Amino acid sequence: MANKKSPASGWPIVQGDFHTGDPNSPVAVVTMGSHLDEGAICSAGAAIAGSCKTENLGLEKVIANVISNPNIRFVITCGTEVKGHLSGQSLIALHQNGVDGGKIVGSKGAIPFIENLSADNIKRFQEQVELVDIMESEDLGAISAKIKELTARDPGAFDAEAMIVEIKEEGGGAAEEGGEVRPMSAEVALIHARMKTIQRTITDIGFYDKYAAGVYGGKVEGLMIGLIVSFVIIGLLLVGHGVS
């Protein structure tokens, strides 16, 4: 029998639109934009099953609940894609490519910015689980069969303790309250993405200005200290010459 570990106390640590099953199961199921029978999916052997409608906060919640349970080694992505947000494609891109400057590399979603997960959190997710992509499938029979197939391949718990992440919902991105997120048109998605990029660029410029001001201040201070030391040395030399 595969070795198991205790998930974080009170797992799942982040609340959301999902059901839970056996926490020792190696499989988590994300139904993306579809509302399937998550209870039946958990009865088929999943540790946790539910939707994920946004490519930012939604993904953060999924990842937080996965890495806080070392027993989960597979994540099945299924159900329909969410128009504009593309949470399924974004999750796959994050697992494959990671995040650069807070943005999911390779994501085609509207606002693919991760604000609550550290580089260590993302690396842990990439190392802990294998993604199994059956996107657009809503067939409970096919999903249940995939759960059984992966359970038979259970490699045992990940070789590290549960990793706990705090998810703050007041950050940018679309909320998932009530499990309802309005799909975005391509035009609206593009506007949201550009607004987010501009916001981050402005923030980066502010940090650069502070850094440049600090460097300039340090140079001036160093110059003054150098002049003072030079005057002291010259004074000592003149005094010594007068004495001799």
Curated annotation (Swiss-Prot):
UniProt GO molecular function: cobalt ion binding; tetrahydromethanopterin S-methyltransferase activity
Superkingdom of origin organism: Archaea
Pfam families (UniProt xref): MtrA
Membrane topology: Single-pass membrane protein
The record's free-text note on cofactor binding: Binds 1 5-hydroxybenzimidazolylcobamide group.
TM regions (residue ranges): 223-243
Gene Ontology biological-process entries: methanogenesis, from carbon dioxide; methylation; one-carbon metabolic process
UniProt entry keywords in alphabetical sequence: Cell membrane, Cobalt, Membrane, Methanogenesis, Methyltransferase, One-carbon metabolism, Transferase, Translocase, Transmembrane, Transmembrane helix
Protein's cellular compartments: Cell membrane
Cytoplasmic side, ranges: 1-222
GO cellular component term, pick one: plasma membrane
Pathways per UniProt: One-carbon metabolism; methanogenesis from CO(2); methyl-coenzyme M from 5,10-methylene-5,6,7,8-tetrahydromethanopterin: step 2/2
Catalytic activity: 5-methyl-5,6,7,8-tetrahydromethanopterin + coenzyme M + 2 Na(+)(in) = 5,6,7,8-tetrahydromethanopterin + methyl-coenzyme M + 2 Na(+)(out)
Principal localisation: membrane
Subunit structure: The complex is composed of 8 subunits; MtrA, MtrB, MtrC, MtrD, MtrE, MtrF, MtrG and MtrH.
NCBIfam families on file: mtrA, PRK00964.1-4
Its job: Part of a complex that catalyzes the formation of methyl-coenzyme M and tetrahydromethanopterin from coenzyme M and methyl-tetrahydromethanopterin. This is an energy-conserving, sodium-ion translocating step.
Family classification: Belongs to the MtrA family.
Record-given protein name: Tetrahydromethanopterin S-methyltransferase subunit A
Origin species: Methanospirillum hungatei JF-1 (strain ATCC 27890 / DSM 864 / NBRC 100397 / JF-1)
